[in-house]
């Protein structure tokens, strides 16, 4: 497995490295890890050019070197303690551009990024490196926030499904790289269904139609839940994942998934993402974005 680890010297980069180092089963497969640091002063080419003119190229080179060393130092310890080989690479580009270009060139199987957590999804993602990377690549991205790395190899994982093909895409990825989850992970297949009774009451108030009974509404919820989860549960079990449980949640998908993950202490949340051609729609309209913003555990986004 090839893993790209972009770093910026923050505590979140260190947490991302610690998550990788916690994957004992993965380390046994000897993954290739590249640690990438992008140097881009104040996000401006002009700033770098002006400083080069004022300070001189030699001084600017030293600044780049010191900043890169600081970024690498933050992740070396957790990787080296586990004896994990990795290589370091520094480029002079905007961070998102650097990650996307290296992804296209090196073709990693996974990008692991530390990201600062906020409760407001728009504040978290608009203008952030994480957003640009998610919008610009189809390679799976693992976003690590401020939760400590799992202490055990076997993870408690939530896979969010909605009846779309992305649930099966996520299953295929996890089957191929199952060492990410440990030898015997506990998997919860999460499906959020609409509150059928409330939906029917709302619909009946807009037109002349009979209101269904609560029992009929609940049967509709169960039917939807069964249709959305059964194929994924069966596929996981067929692929050798023994501990798989379907979980029904009712309400708003983003809120219910994140609150369940936090309440149950999940070690990892896995989600498929359709991707969008409209960038703002991807940021503000995505359940995936909401979950990534509000869930303490790392979130693996597979497209």
Where are these regions (language model features)?
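Structural beta-alpha unit
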Residues: 22, 28, 62, 66, ...
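N-terminal membrane-insertion helices
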Residues: 68-72, 76, 222-229, 233
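General small-molecule cofactor/ligand-binding pocket signal
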Residues: 34-36, 87-91, 142, 188-190, ...
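Active-site-adjacent beta-strand anchor residues
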Residues: 6, 89, 114, 160, ...
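Hydrophobic alpha-helical membrane-association signature
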Residues: 16, 71, 170, 225-228, ...
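Small/aliphatic-rich secondary-structure junction motif
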Residues: 1-55, 84, 155-211, 235-239
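Gly/Ser-rich helix-loop-strand patches that form or flank binding pockets
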Residues: 17, 26, 96-150, 259-303
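A short acidic, glycine-rich active-site loop
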Residues: 55-67, 211-224
């Amino acid at each position: 497995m090839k893993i790209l680890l972009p770093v910026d010297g923050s505590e979140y980069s260190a947490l991302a490295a610690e998550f990788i180092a916690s994957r004992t089963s993965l380390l046994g497969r000897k993954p290739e890890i590249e640690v990438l640091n992008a140097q881009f002063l104040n996000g401006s080419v002009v700033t770098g050019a002006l400083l080069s003119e004022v300070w001189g190229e030699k001084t600017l080179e030293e600044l780049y070197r010191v900043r890169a060393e600081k970024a690498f130092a933050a992740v070396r310890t957790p990787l080296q303690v586990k004896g994990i080989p990795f290589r370091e690479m520094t480029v002079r580009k905007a961070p998102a551009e650097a990650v996307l270009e290296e992804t296209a060139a090196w073709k990693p199987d996974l990008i692991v990024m530390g990201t600062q957590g906020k409760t407001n999804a728009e504040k978290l993602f608009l203008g952030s490196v994480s957003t640009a990377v998610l919008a610009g690549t189809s390679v799976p991205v693992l976003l690590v926030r401020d939760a400590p790395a799992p202490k055990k190899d076997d993870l408690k994982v939530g896979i969010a499904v909605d009846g779309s093909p992305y649930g099966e895409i996520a299953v295929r990825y996890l089957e191929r790289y199952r060492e990410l989850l440990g030898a015997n992970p506990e998997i919860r297949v999460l499906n959020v269904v609409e509150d059928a009774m409330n939906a029917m009451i709302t619909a009946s108030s807009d037109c002349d139609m009979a209101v269904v009974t609560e029992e009929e509404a609940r049967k509709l919820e169960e039917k939807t839940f069964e249709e959305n989860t059964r194929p994924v549960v069966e596929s996981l079990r067929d692929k050798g994942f023994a501990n798989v449980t379907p979980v029904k949640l009712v309400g708003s998908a983003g809120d219910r998934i994140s609150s369940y993950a936090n309440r149950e202490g999940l070690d990892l949340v896995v989600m498929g993402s359709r991707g969008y051609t409209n960038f703002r729609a991807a940021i503000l309209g995505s359940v995936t974005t909401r979950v990534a913003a509000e869930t303490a555990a790392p979130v693996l986004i597979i497209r």
